Curated annotation (Swiss-Prot):
CDD domains: Chorismate_synthase. InterPro entries: Chorismate_synth, Chorismate_synth_AroC_sf, Chorismate_synthase_CS. It comes from the Bacteria. Its cofactor is FMNH2. It comes from Yersinia pestis. This is Chorismate synthase. It catalyses: 5-O-(1-carboxyvinyl)-3-phosphoshikimate = chorismate + phosphate. The keyword Flavoprotein applies. Its EC number is 4.2.3.5. The gene is aroC. One of its GO terms (biological process) is amino acid biosynthetic process.
């Protein structure tokens, strides 16, 4: 499996499986002298971890992170940072019934075909449990971005099923289990979740991530454009089936006179491009949206096959999220932060002494 790393200057490599002993990651490229503690990382891990509300999987993992290397006396040393989280609440017996059966909509069939073997316990490496280490690495990136550049990366639930949430109050996002910024939608979201639980079904979601105060100039045309790397990173999150930058697919129905972000001496007049022009950050907020499919681990019977190719009807048992989009907010934030930090370090290496007379806002 060769796809376990992301980034060039800020490089994150993760390892571990859903029901293995532990999850871990190695982070290379972190500059020395950054104050960082396990408590700093834990803040974001607690936002992602399971079992924190009745709306998510009841697998109760504490997700306590341990810093194994790269930090001495509370600051980064510039060497590789090693992080680890132990798995403590596995119930592998829940998955014994699917040892020889391929769950429809999951990676069971493709992993078996590719590798000839698979860890069926909770999906193994294909499980979203792996994203805990992304969030841990992203917490370090977010702290560096905030301290050194004033960059703030935040996300929210933009839609779940037919319930759309307007960005009305950033503070509200951290005050409810849905990461919803619209108080008027909390009751409809609760009703939808109760309906799904009763039906044994699941639902999809849309998450929006915004990075503010991003410096001008990030991105490496042509193949490592900032939007291309963001799409790559966000698309790598489990269950993500679509990524939009700025207005995304809405541009299909727009005319050029509507979609272009006009500029005056006071700055940009709009941000349809999502803060990226020609693959390079413009200094405006970087905005991305992701669509997450409804989880296939549901109580509704479905058709599949076993290893012998025989038809099987199955119900997926175990502890699962009725909407994976709820806990995806901190994951999406982490992936955007990882990409931004990587590009900031790349920009500093090549163009750190470039000076332009063109105004910046």
């Amino acid at each position: 499996m060769a796809g376990n790393s992301i980034g060039q200057f800020f490089r994150v490599t993760t390892f571990g499986e859903s029901h293995g002993i532990a999850l871990g990651c190695i982070i290379d490229g972190v500059p020395p002298g950054i104050p960082i503690t396990e408590a700093d990382i834990q803040l974001d891990l607690d936002r992602r971890r399971p079992g924190t509300s009745r709306y998510t999987t009841q697998r109760r993992e504490l997700d306590q992170v341990r810093i194994l290397s790269g930090v001495f006396e509370g600051v980064t040393t510039g060497t590789s940072i090693g992080l680890m989280i132990e798995n403590t609440d596995q119930r592998s017996q829940d998955y014994s019934a699917i040892k020889d059966v391929f769950r429809p909509g999951h990676a069971d069939y493709t992993y078996e075909q590719k590798y000839g073997v698979r860890d069926y316990r909770g999906g193994g490496r294909s499980s979203a449990r792996e994203t805990a280490m992304r969030v841990a690495a992203g917490a370090i990136a977010k702290k560096y971005l905030a301290q050194k550049f004033g960059v703030q990366v935040r996300g929210y639930l933009a839609q779940m099923g037919d319930v759309s949430c307007d960005l009305l109050d950033w503070d509200l996002v951290e005050q409810n289990p849905f990461f919803c910024p619209d108080a008027s939608k909390l009751e409809p979201l609760d009703a939808l979740m109760r309906e799904l639980k009763k039906a044994g079904d699941s639902i999809g979601a849309k998450i929006t991530v915004v990075a503010e105060n991003v410096p001008v100039g990030l991105g490496e045309p042509v193949f490592d454009r900032l939007d291309a790397d963001l799409a790559h990173a966000l698309m790598s999150i489990n269950a993500v089936k679509g990524v939009e930058i700025g207005d995304g697919f809405a541009v299909v129905t727009k005319r050029g006179s509507e979609n272009r972000d006009e500029i005056t001496p006071q700055g940009f007049q709009s941000n349809h491009a999502g803060g990226i022009l020609g693959g390079i950050s413009s200094g405006q907020p970087v905005v991305a949206h992701i669509a997450l499919k409804p989880t296939s681990s549901i109580m509704v019977p479905g058709q599949t096959i076993n290893r012998q190719g025989e038809a099987v009807e199955m119900v997926t048992r175990g502890r699962h999220d009725p909407c994976v989009g709820i806990r995806a907010v901190p994951i999406a934030e982490a992936m955007m932060a990882i990409v931004l930090m990587d590009h900031l370090l790349r920009q500093r290496a090549q163009c750190g002494d470039v000076a332009s007379d063109v105004p910046r806002w």
